[in-house]
């Protein structure tokens, strides 16, 4: 007689584990597309010296640009024709005011693609966890739900955190900071957030030597120099103080961009941001091409889990848990014994 595991596929009913239904927040994917489009146009307008007034995002699918001068209106239209009109419809009104609304077919396509990407990312993360014969599949009729079944998983909390972690890695040049408050950071600009910038929170242990780490804020470029899409791989490691950290390698395109950014900004800080929080902001001391390291206050397990989710890729949108059912090992063991006796 052989152990049942070698002969029978042991699902939740036999092995125990967890059954979950998740919803992909597809509005996130639309918002990211709109934010990226708006910032891309902002940068092009600055390079072309085309002055505009307010640039405002009104919803995940709509933004507005105002104050286009009549003398530059034709050039503005040409730029937005090239950069935006495949994805957005343009509306114009008096006074150089323009609104851009995402085309309905593009919104549907982006929502569907975000669910497909989320499903693939979850599959990779579950496989890295070493779960035997998991189920990751579309679920329900709304098109935005994913079924996950993990047989034999005992640490459900860890599995849930790994699955839902957005793992959005961004490397951004620091304009100012760290500062102890958002208000202090923006004082130099009259309390106003400069165009093309954002304030990101983080933790810093260098402001007061020997003191506990404290919350700080950084003013950084809104558009990232490097993102998780540029990663080739990531692994847990140790830093120079023998503390857990995560090292990463960039792909060819990422290495080229990283080399350009670091060579042109020696002496400046580069913020390493994960899910909207600065983990470290080292000073660029020389040109760097294909590798870097994320330091923080990680346990060994946290560093290993971070390496796992970075390797598997960032989620295109956040996830929420709609349903969770746990099947205990006692029920699973009873089911196996009943099958053998039958």
Language-model-detected regions and their locations in the chain:
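Hydrophobic alpha-helical transmembrane signal-anchor segments
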Residues: 1-16
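Non-transmembrane, solvent-exposed regions of membrane trafficking/translocation machinery
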Residues: 25-283
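Short, exposed interaction patches on small structured surface elements
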Residues: 27, 31, 105, 299, ...
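Juxtamembrane "pre-transmembrane" interface segments
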Residues: 149, 302-342
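Membrane-embedded translocation segments of transport machinery
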Residues: 268, 280-316, 329
């Amino acid at each position: 007689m052989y152990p049942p595991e070698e002969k029978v596929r042991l699902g939740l009913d036999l092995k125990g584990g967890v059954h979950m239904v998740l919803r992909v927040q597809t509005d996130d994917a639309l918002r990211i597309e709109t934010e990226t489009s708006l910032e891309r146009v902002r940068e092009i307008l600055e390079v072309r010296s085309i002055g505009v007034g307010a640039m405002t995002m009104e919803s995940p699918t709509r933004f507005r640009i105002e104050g286009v001068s009549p003398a530059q209106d034709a050039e503005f239209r040409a730029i937005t024709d090239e950069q935006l009109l495949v994805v957005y419809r343009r509306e114009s009104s008096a006074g150089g005011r323009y609104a851009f609304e995402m085309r309905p077919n593009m919104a549907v396509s982006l929502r569907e693609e975000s669910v497909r990407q989320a499903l693939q990312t979850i599959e990779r993360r579950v496989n890295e966890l070493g779960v035997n014969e998991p189920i990751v599949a579309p679920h329900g009729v709304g098109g935005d739900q994913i079924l996950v079944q993990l047989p034999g998983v005992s640490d459900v909390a860890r599995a849930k955190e790994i699955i839902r972690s957005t793992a959005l890695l961004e490397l951004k040049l620091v304009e100012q900071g760290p500062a102890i408050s958002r208000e202090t950071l923006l004082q130099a600009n009259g309390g106003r957030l400069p165009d093309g910038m954002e304030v990101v929170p983080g933790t810093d242990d260098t402001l007061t030597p020997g003191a506990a780490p404290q919350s700080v804020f950084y003013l950084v470029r809104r558009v990232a120099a490097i993102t998780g899409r540029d990663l080739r791989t990531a692994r847990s490691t140790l830093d120079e103080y023998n503390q857990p950290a995560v090292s990463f390698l960039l792909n060819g395109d990422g290495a080229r961009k990283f080399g350009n950014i670091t060579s042109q900004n020696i002496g400046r800080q580069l913020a390493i941001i994960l899910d909207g929080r600065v983990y470290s902001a080292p000073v660029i001391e020389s040109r760097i091409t294909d590798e870097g390291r994320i330091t923080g206050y990680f346990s060994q397990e946290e560093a290993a889990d971070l390496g796992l989710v970075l390797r598997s890729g960032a989620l295109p949108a956040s996830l929420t848990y709609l349903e969770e059912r746990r099947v205990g090992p006692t029920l699973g063991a009873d089911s196996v014994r009943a099958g053998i006796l039958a």
